[in-house]
Amino acid sequence: MSAFIVLGAQWGDEGKGKMTDYLAEEAEVVVRFQGGNNAGHTVEVGDKQYKLHLIPSGILYDDKLNVIGNGVVVDPKALFEEINYLEGVGVKVTPEKLIISDRAQLIMPYHKTLDVLKEKARGKNDIGTTGKGIGPCYTDKFERCGIRVCDLMHEDVFKEKLEENIRMKNEYITKVLGGEPLSFSEILNEYLEFAKKLRPFVQDTSVKVYDNIKENKTVLFEGAQGMLLDIDYGTYPYVTSSNTTAGGVCSGIGVGPNMVTNAVGITKAYTTRVGKGPFPTELIDETGDWIREKGHEYGVTTGRSRRCGWLDLVIVKTAARVSGLTSLAVTKIDTLAGLEKLKVCVGYKFDGKVIDYFPASLEDLAKCEPVYEDFDGWDDSVAEARTYEELPENAKKYLNRIAEFTDTKISIIGVGPKREQTIRIDSI
């Protein structure tokens, strides 16, 4: 039995798409357990590039079962747009390759309207939402007024729940947020059409995943975003609306913790984040700009430029602790090639002492000053390496320090965006 998790160990955008695609070769089932189409994965296979948002990365293989679990929030319109995109580039998406939990919450048009209007109302205190309705959908889930996929499969149930939600949401949208009311009939007709297309993909995914694990099939749980965007352990409130840590797997798909054998944390060789929020090692200078351009650090989903900075090992160590990481995959060491000197954060100066953990309070975090160690850089030959031995010595020293500080072995190294630009040095 082998069931393992692939998680982001930073603020997302660590290269999970590529690593999930790489590791999916060893898996028979690939499962998304949280988030929605606010996530973005880029996978390069040969000379082709694929951009995924909601559908698991295993869809690029013909022989993998891909699962969207109950912890995911599903926008049917975005789902079928992604299916059409994949079909258009030659990737088949059928109910034999993709199944969707009947317990997953549906993103509705009013969720997206609320997302945009509430963000606008926050003014300078906006949190950088993607505007895709993710947060409002999770809010409805916990307020117990959300509409699930299984509700959409029963027209009378869906109609009743939609009518109640439209009545309440329109009052809030018009009277509090100053927006335009949404049409009940338009949404009803649109979603009943979605129901017909969605039905063949829908089943109890918890049972399906459980059965596959019991049959000793290899299952890969694919995380979206990153540890520091977790609703509990991230830089709150500049976070996403779900649990992005290993704990989210059990509730987000419906399997017990004893069924998960390993957890791989994905980290870049440097640090990035999108939008607002604290970033202790951020480089607001030419070096930061250089990393952004060389690393093509622009969001897959939003197109927003990413803030760039030195590698912060305090963050990665926190991710290893919170999610019980059994190994790390370090990506994009090729991006740093050409820099003569590098810095790595190994602690924060805070209130006269050095700490190696991430404070909960943003006010405390703002007072933290990074403690750096210096490293010599390496050249572009790193992108040609296919074994650990072929890596430049300075790159090896850099990687060894990551493993030492986080007390977590490195199992995989990414030296470029393509599937074949991956070095496997240990088991996960």
Swiss-Prot record:
This protein's GO CC annotations: cytoplasm
Binding site for IMP: 13-16, 38-41, 130, 144, 225, 240, 304
One Gene Ontology term from the biological process aspect of the record: IMP metabolic process
Domain of life of the source: Bacteria
Disulfide bonds: none
Keyword annotations of the record: Cytoplasm, GTP-binding, Ligase, Magnesium, Metal-binding, Nucleotide-binding, Purine biosynthesis
InterPro entries: Adenylosuccin_syn_GTP-bd (IPR018220), Adenylosuccin_syn_Lys_AS (IPR033128), Adenylosuccinate_synth_dom1 (IPR042109), Adenylosuccinate_synth_dom2 (IPR042110), Adenylosuccinate_synth_dom3 (IPR042111), Adenylosuccinate_synthetase (IPR001114), P-loop_NTPase (IPR027417)
EC number from the UniProt entry: 6.3.4.4
Pathway(s) per entry: Purine metabolism; AMP biosynthesis via de novo pathway; AMP from IMP: step 1/2
Metal-binding keyword on record: yes
Active site: 13, 41
Annotated positions binding substrate: 300-306
PANTHER family in UniProt: ADENYLOSUCCINATE SYNTHETASE
Family designation: Belongs to the adenylosuccinate synthetase family.
Protein name: Adenylosuccinate synthetase
Taxonomic path: Bacteria, Bacillati, Bacillota, Clostridia, Eubacteriales
